[in-house]
């Protein structure tokens, strides 16, 4: 019984960590409009990929 309880606690802990990390990633998305930011820098286009703005020259 105690092994099951420990397993459930570990599963809940890992679930909470994954939930927090996924929320952080959503909030960490590109804060600026990438296309406009990149065009202003002289690039032809820009896209937000994995929370970072990538410019295409």
Curated annotation (Swiss-Prot):
Instruction: Please verify whether the record's keywords include Disulfide bond.
Output: yes
The entry's keywords: Disulfide bond, Ion channel impairing toxin, Neurotoxin, Potassium channel impairing toxin, Secreted, Signal, Toxin, Voltage-gated potassium channel impairing toxin
GO molecular function annotation: ion channel inhibitor activity; potassium channel regulator activity; toxin activity
Where is the site described as Basic residue of the functional dyad found in this chain?
A: 47
Which Cys-Cys disulphide bridges does the record give?
30-48, 34-53, 38-55
Location of this chain's protein in the cell: Secreted
What InterPro entries does the annotation carry?
Scorpion_toxin-like_sf, Scorpion_toxinS_K_inh
UniProt main location, coarse: secreted
The record's tissue-specificity note reads: Expressed by the venom gland.
The reply on keyword Acetylation is: no
GO cellular component terms attached to this protein's record = extracellular region
Provide the leader sequence positions.
1-22
Hey, where's the site called Aromatic residue of the functional dyad on this chain?
Answer: 56
Could you share any additional remarks the record makes about this protein? Negative results: does not inhibit large conductance calcium-activated potassium channels (BK).
Domain comment text? Has the structural arrangement of an alpha-helix connected to a beta-sheet by disulfide bonds (CSalpha/beta).
Query: What is the protein's known function?
Result: Recombinant toxin that reversibly inhibits the potassium current of mKv1.3/KCNA3 channel stably expressed in COS7 cells (IC(50)=150 nM). Also shows a weak inhibition on Kv1.2/KCNA2, Kv1.3/KCNA3 and TRPV1 channels.
Family that this chain belongs to: Belongs to the short scorpion toxin superfamily. Potassium channel inhibitor family. Alpha-KTx 26 subfamily.
What name goes with this protein? Answer: Potassium channel toxin alpha-KTx 26.1
The organism named in the record is Olivierus martensii (Manchurian scorpion)
